[in-house]
């Protein structure tokens, strides 16, 4: 039992660190780089920004890939922690988070395509510069749609994980309950937004996932520095042995 507790404690710290690391990475990549280079409604200016700061643009892509890798580590750590509570639900959450991670791979490929369109390669000379800029902007804009498709699955994954955290008592139940509510809110808002794009005029897009983001930051700090509630784990394991 001691070995099991030590293993869960280690994976909890991995999950906590990865929560915080992935959050910081995605903020740097998107708010610090991509949003800085992307000019809304202006394909020509966006193209000039990218080509003038190609290295920075590539760093943003690298950050996206690091974020994607972090998501894989996170889903594995959470699966190990939550599997003793309910293996099927833990697997479902891991699958949904994997789908979300794959959408980031698609977004990275779109960014590489945009960069290739602006590269000035010889085989692109048959196209007008404005057309290439518009196509590059189109591929970059597609990332917006891909993100919200992925966010639906991420919200579902977080909802399931939060429920299992609530059921397990690994973290304070009030925090886990907030996670369930904020994650379900994110998934619901995203689903409605996909069907009704004007929904963003009623609820700002930032409010879709901001509450869930707050939950993940707090949970990350809790798991990294506070760890799991080990007495509850020991009690559950003892009860399991008595039933056998």
Locations of regions flagged by a protein language model:
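Hydrophobic, aromatic-enriched alpha-helical segments typical of multi-pass transmembrane helices
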Residues: 1-244
């Amino acid at each position: 039992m001691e070995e099991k507790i030590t293993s869960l404690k280690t994976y909890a710290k991995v999950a906590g660190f990865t929560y915080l690391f992935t959050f910081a990475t995605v903020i740097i990549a998107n708010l610090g780089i991509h949003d800085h280079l992307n000019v809304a409604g202006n394909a020509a200016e966006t193209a000039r920004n990218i080509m003038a700061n190609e290295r920075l643009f590539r760093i943003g892509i690298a950050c996206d890939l690091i974020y994607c890798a972090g998501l894989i580590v996170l889903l594995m750590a959470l699966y190990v922690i939550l599997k003793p509570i309910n293996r099927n639900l833990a697997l479902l959450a891991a699958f949904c988070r994997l789908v979300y991670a794959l959408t980031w791979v698609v977004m990275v490929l779109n960014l590489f395509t945009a960069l290739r369109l602006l590269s000035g390669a010889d085989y692109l000379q048959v196209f007008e510069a404005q057309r290439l800029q518009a196509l590059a902007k189109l591929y970059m804009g597609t990332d917006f749609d891909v993100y919200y498709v992925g966010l639906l699955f991420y919200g579902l994954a977080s909802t399931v994980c939060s429920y299992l955290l609530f059921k397990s008592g690994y973290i304070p139940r009030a925090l886990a309950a907030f996670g369930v509510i904020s994650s379900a809110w994110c998934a619901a808002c995203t689903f409605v937004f996909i069907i009704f794009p004007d929904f963003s005029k009623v609820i700002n897009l930032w409010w879709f996932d901001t509450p869930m983001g707050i939950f993940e930051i707090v949970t990350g700090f809790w798991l990294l520095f506070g760890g799991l509630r080990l007495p509850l784990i020991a009690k559950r394991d003892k009860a399991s042995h008595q039933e056998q």
